[in-house]
Amino acid sequence: MLHRAGDREEARNRLTALWHEIGPQGDAFHRCALAHYMADTQDDPRDELDWDLRALEAAEGFVTERPDNAAPGASSVADGPGPRHPLVALRAFFPSLHLNIAADYAALDRPADAHAQLRRARASINALADGAYRQGLRDAIDRLQLRIDGAAGRMA
């Protein structure tokens, strides 16, 4: 992706065009994934938080208002990329979404909100199958927890 190669502005421009194409009533899975990527292209932590919250809103809306013809979701998802039902794929986003939102709150010096999101990330990680992705998220949650707690300790 462009933003990982250092061209955040061009990535933002292209993702914004896609966002307008999908629209607010577009497919929740696509809105979630796109907003999740869009957050990573932001320079301002408040904007990053706004996009991460949009991604979470799309995911939560889809999970709670699942289409009648959707296949029942499995209790866990496969480790890594691969085809799966969008509901299951969206459930796999929750730990990462909550982790990103926690990081956004930490960047905005809102440790209580960050801690609340870390708790949600830990609670939602059980939807993932054991494997490298799940362990990587657990490690990232632990690192952010230590960083937030360390910052709070320096302020006391």
Please identify what each model-predicted range represents.
Residues D50-G61, D109-A129:
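TPR/TPR-like (Sel1-like) alpha-helical repeat modules
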Residues A11, P24-R31, E48, L87-L90, ...:
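Residues that mark the junctions of alpha-helical repeat units in TPR/alpha-solenoid scaffolds
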